[in-house]
């Protein structure tokens, strides 16, 4: 049975709050250099995404609560042209994140060529909201949603040469400077 949820993303300078049916699902917060802190509020998981490598890079996901490795995402050499990221989840389970259009407004997760999660952003409203459909709500669904949003945001920033959300990021810095 397919389940549908609405989602919304709010952000300030490199910090994103992801709401699922208006309930805070989690946060994505840019750390130092090539790290992101991902907190899944619903389950209390605290994760660290670390990008290592230059040409053949990978994103390693570590659970900060237990210290164990959750998985690894292989980044294509030319991610601008190739819209698939392979995710090897703990236990050797393989999944693929697929961007369905150039800027990744529509993306999905596949396991064994079956779609387990699909997201479509409503670009008409322009408020970073949309619909997420799940084939079934699994234990790792929250992780897949936040990881997918992370990959989508990463791709949008790379493809727009850093201009994606630039006005919002600059407005946030001006607001901080006015208070000082």
Language model regions located:
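Acidic (Asp/Glu) and glycine-rich low-complexity loops/linkers
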Residues: 75-76, 148
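Beta-strand C-termini and the immediately following turn/loop, strongest in propeller blades
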Residues: 51, 74, 97-99
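Short, conserved, surface-exposed binding loops centered on an aromatic residue
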Residues: 61-62, 77-79, 87
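Short, well-structured hydrophobic secondary-structure segments
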Residues: 38-69
